[in-house]
Amino acid sequence: MIPAVTDDDPLEDPLDDDVAPGLDDAEPEPEPRDEHDEPSRPATGSRIGGWVARRGSRFGKGVLDRCAPLSAAIGGGLALWLSFPPIGWWFTAFPGLALLGWVLTRTATTKAGGFGYGVLFGLAFYVPLLPWISGLVGAVPWLALAFAESLFCGLFGLGAVVVVRLPGWPLWFATLWVAAEWAKSTFPFGGFPWGASSYGQTNGPLLALARIGGAPLVSFAVALIGFSLTLLTAQIVWWWRHGHKPGVPAPAVMLPGVAIAASLLVTALVWPQVRQSGTGAGDDTAVTVAAVQGNVPRLGLEFNAQRRAVLDNHVKETLRLADDVKAGRAAQPMFVIWPENSSDIDPLLNADASAQITTAAEAIDAPILVGGVVRADGYTPDNPVANNTVIVWEPTDGPGERHDKQIVQPFGEYLPWRGFFKHLSSYADRAGYFVPGTGTGVVHAAGVPIGITTCWEVIFDRAARESVLNGAQVLAVPSNNATFDEAMSAQQLAFGKLRAVEHDRYVVVAGTTGISAVIAPDGHEISRTEWFQPAYLDNQIRLKTDLTPATKWGPIVQAVLVIAGVAVLLIAILHNGRFAPRMLRRRSATTVKR
């Protein structure tokens, strides 16, 4: 057990080495002297030199004292980044969070310091994670987004310093981590879940936990293991240094040991179910599906020509698939999935685009899910609102059911507060006028209910879950990554892997430029394309109907973790005296000693 704070604990000196240099060295009051005395005074230059030397010494000491935590915060953020694609060293997330935990549990770390170290950790994580944004809009929006997301890491750091005095702080740190990820996935403008720690685990064993609790439970396990490593390491190091002294208790390793063991045990219990689902065993119906990656022209074409060239490329690649089917080189697909924006020319209004798509559908003799841009209700030349849609295009009847994207991307597909932001940046005019659609998230092609999560939608937990609850037996992720780079596409593919395990469904990712893939319910890639080349995938999958615990109760799991984090934060605030000055509070023996 970790000892709690008692009333017998000595008060901590508030003026420790976390105080800014030079704030606690006021000059003493001069002693009274006779006015006839003629004391020898040092020269003015000497006094100034001494003053500068003292303050310089304190400043230097302060910098040296902070080198270790600053380096640890930066190193921790970089380690968490390494766990994400395209590098994908999933195991580095644990030492990354352990380093952050060490910084936040130092006795010298104040609440303001916790916020600052958290922001620094976040910057070291998000800046290298999101550089693909700069390819379209430049460095300023990329760095601004990285900083905005880092603020949530800062809020976590602030909360962590508040709760560190409570017994069992690694557990409370983990709940606060999940709460911070929920907050950044919700606010502002609908949130930005990109960078949730769960998505760095799609190549690791903890991915299995997505089946029972979704992305939040995976993030919780990552954080719990990481922060438990902080306490475990600190206790062992402290005991190594002081254990030879009489009366020194053994290190308190029970809590971190149990936390790590429990996480691994639950993972081991769930993995066999996940693995069995991915092998294709059972009575599930087997069907063949295809995904077409038509690719886009390189830079140099005028915008309208680019749109037409993209459509032509996808028609051409579908015709190649049809030829291979006739020649016996590929299996006949039941339906074909095209990427998002494969027809940016409105096929419901443009007869030529419609004819081209019909030609492709007739050639392959299967319905095609076409990613298109169509006019939305209320369209006017001054307000050119549109829907980002997926249309089921039948070989004989043409357009049928459609899914209008329900979660549209701020600052890309639409511009929040357009009247305000257009005065701040020339990039504002690049944002679209897309409006969210409505529906169940499911379309039917060849009698198969297909859940659609278009590009941006796949990173939000609710999108795929709604589709599966509404009967989807397979999930499709039409995506357009042509304006970004391969790193972004690799990161998005990780979201598809987690959704496959979370909902026990095959996931078919179709990208204009890649990476397209067919993902099994255990998260492994059955097939995939290379980046920036025309290609198609033609694979057999199984239609799944069972609902996982995460599908049924995932939001409840997240709510419990978030509420626990908020509740323990409130308890800690009351326990600490409502953010009273540090000289009036005591720190727990469980904090990491410097």
From Swiss-Prot:
The chain crosses the membrane at residues 68-87, 117-134, 139-160, 222-239, 252-269, 555-572. Its main location: membrane. InterPro entries: Apolipo_AcylTrfase, C-N_Hydrolase, C-N_Hydrolase_sf, LNT_N. It is found in: Cell membrane. Residues 287-543 form the CN hydrolase domain. Residues 88-116, 161-221, 270-554 are extracellular. Interacts with Ppm1 (AC A0QZ12) upon coexpression in E.coli, which increases the PPM synthase activity of Ppm1. This is Apolipoprotein N-acyltransferase. It comes from Mycolicibacterium smegmatis (strain ATCC 700084 / mc(2)155). The gene is lnt.
